[in-house]
């Protein structure tokens, strides 16, 4: 009953098997009284209200496996968590607001650091920071990022095989590996959720919120990048992002098509080609800009 009622059991079991291979004993599960008193909520995904009206030739771009990628990039795991930066705001830090910050380590508040000193601290001590201010060591790969990396590679392998058999016309094998890659996707995306589940053995609200809040920051940054791409070409200062949902941004290709092909009536076939070209351009621009966000 519990294996079905609590889908976290599968993920917990995978972690326990991995720890056993390493010869590491996992911590005990929290007892039921702890579970009952620890049902705090954590920040979820960011959803932007859609721009009202009818929008033509809309395309969407999504961040591949956003939550698993965040966990792997920041090295979010129970044993890699170091402390917290008080009053952390990623956008303010990027904008150089000349704030000072203090760090809490082992329950003790340390002295004030300038932005430059804090950046030096991150670099010299191999530390990453999430959007809720939690610090993680990055000199040693964490348990959960290691598992996710393995599952991520397995999904890529299944997708590659699905494409291979699809191109060969083998529908049975294509269907099998396509289902397998989809299952891997579900498993990958489930991990962040159970981090904030009190019945999960490795429950940690900070780690759960580190994932979702960083996701919020990342998708908002994506919107800014997309708008910058549009505004730079069009010579405007507008918000062209029609809608945001978790890991996806939606734009219309119409403004750019009208700028590039003035006074030209394009057929649906030609418009489809143009929208694919524009989506590919914007996607490339976004991908090349994410390193700035990571730094």
Which residues are covered by each model-predicted region?
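Common nucleic-acid-contacting/processivity interface regions adjacent to the catalytic cores
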Residues: 1-78, 84, 91, 170-224, ...
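Compact, glycine/acidic-enriched structural inserts
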Residues: 84-108
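Short, hydrophobic/amphipathic alpha-helical packing segments
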Residues: 152, 215-223, 279-290
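Conserved core architecture of multi-subunit DNA-directed RNA polymerases
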Residues: 40, 65, 100, 158, ...
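Acidic, low-complexity intrinsically disordered tails
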Residues: 100-125
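Active-site cores of enzymes that catalyze phosphoryl transfer or operate on phosphate-rich substrates
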Residues: 119-200
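Active-site palm subdomain of RNA-directed nucleic acid polymerases
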Residues: 219-246
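C-terminal polymerase-core module
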Residues: 250-295
């Amino acid at each position: 009953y519990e294996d079905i009622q609590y889908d976290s059991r599968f993920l917990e079991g995978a972690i326990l098997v991995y720890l056993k291979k390493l010869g590491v004993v996992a911590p005990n599960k929290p007892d039921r009284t702890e579970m009952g008193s620890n049902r705090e909520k954590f920040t979820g995904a960011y959803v932007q209200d859609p721009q009202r009206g009818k929008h033509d030739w809309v395309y969407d771009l999504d961040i591949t496996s956003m939550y698993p990628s965040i966990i792997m990039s920041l090295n979010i795991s129970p044993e890699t968590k170091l402390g917290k930066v008080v009053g952390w705001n990623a956008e303010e830090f990027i904008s150089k607001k000349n704030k000072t910050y203090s760090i809490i380590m082992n329950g003790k508040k340390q002295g004030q650091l300038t932005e430059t000193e804090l950046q030096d601290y991150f670099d010299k001590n191999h530390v990453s920071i999430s959007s809720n201010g939690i610090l993680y060591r990055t000199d040693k790969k964490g348990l959960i990022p290691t598992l996710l990396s393995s599952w991520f590679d397995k999904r890529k392998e299944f997708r590659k095989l699905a494409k291979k058999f699809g191109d060969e016309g083998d529908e049975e094998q294509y269907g099998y590996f396509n289902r397998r890659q989809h299952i891997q996707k579900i498993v990958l995306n489930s991990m962040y959720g159970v981090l904030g589940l009190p019945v999960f053995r490795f429950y940690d609200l900070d780690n759960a919120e580190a994932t979702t809040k960083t996701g919020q920051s990342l998708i908002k940054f994506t919107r800014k990048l997309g708008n910058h791409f549009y505004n730079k070409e069009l010579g405007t200062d507008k918000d062209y992002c029609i809608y945001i949902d978790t890991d996806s941004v939606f734009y219309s290709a119409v403004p750019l098509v009208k700028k590039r092909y003035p006074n030209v009536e394009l057929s649906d076939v030609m418009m489809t080609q143009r929208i694919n070209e524009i989506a590919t351009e914007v996607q490339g621009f976004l991908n090349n800009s994410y390193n700035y966000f990571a730094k």
